[in-house]
Design a protein with these regions (language model features):
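Generic start-of-chain signal for non-secretory N-termini
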Residues: 1-9
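Cofactor-binding active-site loop characterized by glycine-rich and histidine/acidic residues
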Residues: 6-7, 18-21, 33-131
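N-terminal capping segment at the start of a domain
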Residues: 11-27
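Histidine-centered catalytic micro-motifs
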Residues: 30
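Single conserved hydrophobic/aromatic residue that forms the stacking wall/gate
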Residues: 134-138
């Protein structure tokens, strides 16, 4: 999707999702999510090589490491609208037994999530570890 208007429309829908999710449960951090909307939409729709079919190994696709897990509303919306899981699931955000909690985790098997994110800054460490492991494997 490289059409500027399409990216704008996609981003507008993501922002609506963020506000609906956070408002429905009266919990979450809308500011960070709203501020990252263009960035994540552009990455997932125009820059990254990705696979909504998803496998944990991430072969033949670009990997995204989310450090600040409190922006999960934008991450969940972009993943859902990119085909990783049904958009209707966004309505379960932060509800009991939902896969969409306040910080993304891998234990619920949510497509598009490869690592739990909680501590700020852990994404850069995870990426560095992955690159070091790939270098050793070569």
């Amino acid at each position: 999707m490289s059409n500027t208007q399409q990216l704008h429309d996609f981003t507008t829908q993501v922002r609506r999702d963020i506000l609906r999710m956070v408002h429905a449960v009266n919990s979450g951090h809308p500011g960070g999510s709203l501020g990252c909307a263009e960035f994540l939409v552009t990455l997932y729709q125009d820059v990254m090589k990705r696979n909504p079919g998803f496998s944990m190994d991430g072969k033949n696709e670009d990997l995204f490491f989310l450090s600040n897990g409190h922006i999960s509303p934008v991450f969940y919306s972009v993943l859902a609208r990119s085909g990783y899981f049904p958009v209707a699931e966004l309505a379960t955000f932060r509800k009991l037994n939902s896969r969409l909690q306040g910080h993304p985790t891998t234990h619920e098997g949510l497509p598009g999530i490869r690592m739990a994110s909680g501590s700020l800054g852990q994404g850069s460490v995870s990426y560095t570890h992955l690159r070091a492991h790939e270098t050793e494997a070569d």
